[in-house]
A protein has these predicted regions:
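Repeat-based blade/solenoid architectures
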Residues: 87-98, 145-146, 163
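Beta-propeller blade repeat segments, especially FG-GAP/WD-type strand-to-loop junctions
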Residues: 123-136, 169-172
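Beta-propeller fold detector
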Residues: 135-142, 178-184
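Beta-propeller blade termini
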Residues: 96-105, 143-153
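Acidic, small-residue rich beta-repeat scaffolds with periodic aromatic anchors
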Residues: 14-66, 156-230
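Acidic/hydrophobic-patterned starts of short beta strands in beta-sheet-rich repeat architectures
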Residues: 106-117, 149-156
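Sec-dependent signal peptide recognition
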Residues: 1-4
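C-terminal motif of bacterial Sec signal peptides marking the signal peptidase cleavage site
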Residues: 9-12
């Protein structure tokens, strides 16, 4: 998942060709600039005083063709929930509460793009594959998303007071996120998902999985967040 991969052969030589690597990074930065502009417009629309009336009338914020193409169909629901809820938890939300971050989280030399709140909550994560941006995930503010030092994405989602889902994701260089571990509990019943199959587990096993995967050092992005601007 990563910045522009022009051809498979190109990827292999990028490490040994600093000039080519810089060229690829700059090209993908321009792709991200489009998404950052979309982000700013989305925040402006969502924070407008008459937003609820606009939504009731079927008026939505406009996004670029680039962003629209970056959101896979299966992510539509999560994207909409993120959009509706992202100001939650902010007493008096302003544009200054929102920022972005470019960070290479899988050590391939190319950064991913984070849409992130000033308090560190991650709203969305993008990468670039085949010269096009790809949405890796959109997250409700109630979710907790962090990145480990070894580049794994930790996602704690909630479907309610008694429903939690833990996911450990790896970000390879192919525009998709690989699930390394997935477990949680629903109405008090702990479970683990392996190869797409959901199986019940004990609370002790759930605790062990949480300790193994989630009680680890994560990266503090607070000093790297860039403010949104027109």
């Amino acid at each position: 998942m990563i910045l522009m991969i022009m051809a498979l052969a190109l990827v292999g030589c990028a490490v040994d060709n600093p000039a080519l690597e810089t060229e690829v990074q700059e090209a993908n930065s321009s792709v991200y600039e489009v998404l950052i502009a979309d982000y700013y417009n989305m925040v402006q629309f969502r924070l407008s005083e008459d937003v609820h009336m606009k939504l009731e009338q079927g008026e939505y914020y406009e996004i670029s063709d680039t962003l629209e193409a970056a959101i896979p169909e299966e992510a539509d629901y999560d994207w909409w929930c993120m959009f509706v809820e992202f100001p939650s938890g902010l007493t008096d939300p302003q544009v200054t509460d929102f920022g972005y971050l470019l960070k290479d989280i899988n050590a391939d030399g190319q950064p991913e793009l984070f849409w992130i709140l000033s308090d560190g909550r991650i709203l969305a994560l993008f990468t670039v594959w085949d010269a096009k941006p790809v949405l890796l995930g959109a997250y409700w503010p109630r979710s907790r998303v962090s990145v480990t030092e070894d580049g794994h994405l930790l996602v704690l989602g909630s479907g309610g007071a008694d429903s939690q889902l833990y996911q450990v994701l790896q970000i390879p260089s192919n525009g998709e996120a690989n699930i390394l571990a997935e477990f949680g509990q629903d109405v008090g019943q702990a479970y683990q998902i392996t190869d797409g199959k959901k199986e019940s587990i004990t609370q002790q096993k759930l605790t062990e999985l949480i300790e193994t995967y989630f009680e680890v050092e994560t990266i503090d992005f607070s000093k790297e967040i860039q403010p949104l601007s027109p």
